[in-house]
């Protein structure tokens, strides 16, 4: 009998029963809730006169709609200017109180983006199944979890039953071998992967990221890569449990205590792919050949490295790709063949569930070296992913490095990743962003998003245009 993949082991450990149609009933260990996708789910519970099946499995925090400007944030929910956004946060507060679900409220020191808060609090542990009404739930797969986003109706199902009906995906392994060069980060790795396989490359698969690059990568770096598995077409991205995983989890507030630790660790260490496991698809990439990446268009697969130029139509692999590029040239206000380093920028955003952890902020701060944000930059903001990240950064003096350089130091939240709160781009503005999506209008109507690493974003802020952080 062939060995099992990491995905197989996680699936089998949580499969309650197989169904006649080929689907399975899967038990869910951890359910993360926020203000946008939960109101109708709670309403459904109430109308059916149901209560959450397992209260302790649920944790909530507002993140999408919260203001990041300190003055507005100090007013709490009342500081949210948009009526709909304010109502969503108030509704989350009310529902959590009504159903007795634990919540890190807007100005709780533990509040933040759920995909940052979950791991840092130890709420997400190796071997778990984790769901949230948000597509970037794949982030948690970095801890050796089966984690994916769900819709609002499924949020209600999990609240009511702690289970979901799912169909098993195929297994894909993406191996990145060798060592990364100086100035190349986990964000560059995942952008390079998406550039290679496309945004549909992982469709129908659960992706396991493996190889020397991932073995050497920090836990926060792994989270960045798994976060963008969805941009590669997969609902699920994961990395096997190893010493890095165990060391990260130990001592977290919700992690097992000392008396339970040995047993928990022994169980967690079973979550890896067996040597003889068979994958439906295997892709290999030489990590030593990856350079800092920049997205130029309106899809995460429209990516080149910093030394290259916007591709020309004759480079397209088919007519559909050429049509997409032609539309992207127009929307982005770029010319085919234009050097990436010639793209002038208006705003800089360092944050999001992809790149707002302490290592990300350290990477960005290290680039500043006493320099100032370019006069041509209208706004450069740094938004920590959680209250705990913000406090740690301030304890290390990173906030002062940013503000002295001309960045704004904001309060935790999803911020400019998506145009759902007050942090938005104006039409035709170019933004170097550490977020995960560059679709048309993602950061504001007519806004032009370029996906980069925190270090590349910081360097771009200082130069006013994209530069190669390796030589900056």
UniProtKB/Swiss-Prot annotation:
Q: Where does [4Fe-4S] cluster bind?
A: 353, 414, 417
Q: Name one GO molecular function term.
A: 4 iron, 4 sulfur cluster binding
Question: Per the record's keyword annotation, is Signal included, yes or no?
Answer: no
Q: Report the cofactors.
A: [4Fe-4S] cluster
| One of the GO biological process terms | L-leucine biosynthetic process
The cofactor binding remark recorded in the entry reads:
Binds 1 [4Fe-4S] cluster per subunit.
Pathway the protein contributes to: Amino-acid biosynthesis; L-leucine biosynthesis; L-leucine from 3-methyl-2-oxobutanoate: step 2/4
Catalysed reactions listed for this entry: (2R,3S)-3-isopropylmalate = (2S)-2-isopropylmalate
Summarizing the function annotation, the protein's role is:
Catalyzes the isomerization between 2-isopropylmalate and 3-isopropylmalate, via the formation of 2-isopropylmaleate.
**A UniProt-annotated Pfam family:** Aconitase
Q: Which NCBIfam families match?
A: leuC (TIGR00170), PRK05478.1 (NF004016), PRK12466.1 (NF009116)
HAMAP family for this protein: LeuC_type1
Record-linked Gene3D superfamilies: Aconitase, domain 3
**TM region positions:** none
**Quaternary structure per UniProt?**
Heterodimer of LeuC and LeuD.
This protein is called 3-isopropylmalate dehydratase large subunit
EC number(s) given by UniProt: 4.2.1.33
Quote the gene name from the UniProt entry: leuC
Protein family per UniProt: Belongs to the aconitase/IPM isomerase family. LeuC type 1 subfamily.
Q: Which residues form a coiled coil?
A: none
Q: Which keywords does the record carry?
A: 4Fe-4S, Amino-acid biosynthesis, Branched-chain amino acid biosynthesis, Iron, Iron-sulfur, Leucine biosynthesis, Lyase, Metal-binding
């Amino acid at each position: 009998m062939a060995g099992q993949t990491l995905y197989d082991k996680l699936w089998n450990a949580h499969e309650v029963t197989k169904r006649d149609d080929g689907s399975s009933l899967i038990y869910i260990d951890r359910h993360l809730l926020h203000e946008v996708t939960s109101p109708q789910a709670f309403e459904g519970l109430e109308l059916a006169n149901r209560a959450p099946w397992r209260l302790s499995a649920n944790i909530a925090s507002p993140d999408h709609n919260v203001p990041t400007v300190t003055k507005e944030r100090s007013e709490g929910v009342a500081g949210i200017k948009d009526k709909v956004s304010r109502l969503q946060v108030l509704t989350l507060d009310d529902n959590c109180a009504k159903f007795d679900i634990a919540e890190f409220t807007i100005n709780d020191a533990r509040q933040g983006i759920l995909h940052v808060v979950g791991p840092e609090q130890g709420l997400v542990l190796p071997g778990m199944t984790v769901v949230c009404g948000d597509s970037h739930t794949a982030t948690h797969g970095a801890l050796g979890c089966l984690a994916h986003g769900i819709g609002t109706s499924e949020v209600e199902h999990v609240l009511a039953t702690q289970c979901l009906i799912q169909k098993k995906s195929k297994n894909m392994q993406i191996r990145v071998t060798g060592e990364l060069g100086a100035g190349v980060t986990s964000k560059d790795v995942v952008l390079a992967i998406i550039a290679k396989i496309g945004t549909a490359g992982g469709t129908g698969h659960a992706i396991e990221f493996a190889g020397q690059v991932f073995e050497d990568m920090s836990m926060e770096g792994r989270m960045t890569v798994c976060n963008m598995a969805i941009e590669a077409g997969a609902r699920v991205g994961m990395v096997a449990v190893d010493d890095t995983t165990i060391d990260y989890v130990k001592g977290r507030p919700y992690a097992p205590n000392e008396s339970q630790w040995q047993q928990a660790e022994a169980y967690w260490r079973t979550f890896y792919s067996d040597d003889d496991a068979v994958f439906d698809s295997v892709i290999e990439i030489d990590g030593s050949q990856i350079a800092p990446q920049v997205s130029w268009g309106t899809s995460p697969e429209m990516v080149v490295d910093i030394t290259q130029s916007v591709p020309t139509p004759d480079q397209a692999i088919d007519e559909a790709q050429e049509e997409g590029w032609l539309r992207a040239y127009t929307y982005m206000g770029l010319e085919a063949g234009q050097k990436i380093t010639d793209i002038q920028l208006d705003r800089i955003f360092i944050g999001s569930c992809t790149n707002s952890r302490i290592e990300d902020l350290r990477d960005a701060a290290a680039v500043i070296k006493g320099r100032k944000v370019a006069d041509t930059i209208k706004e450069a903001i740094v938004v920590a992913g959680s209250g705990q990240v913000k406090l740690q950064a301030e304890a290390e003096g990173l906030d002062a490095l940013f503000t002295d350089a001309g960045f704004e130091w904001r309060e935790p939240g999803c911020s400019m990743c998506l145009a759902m709160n007050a942090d938005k781009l104006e039409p035709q503005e170019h933004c170097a962003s550490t977020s995960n999506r560059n679709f048309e209008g993602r950061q504001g109507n007519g806004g032009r998003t370029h996906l980069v690493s925190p270090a590349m974003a910081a360097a771009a802020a200082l130069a006013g245009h994209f530069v190669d952080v390796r030589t900056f």
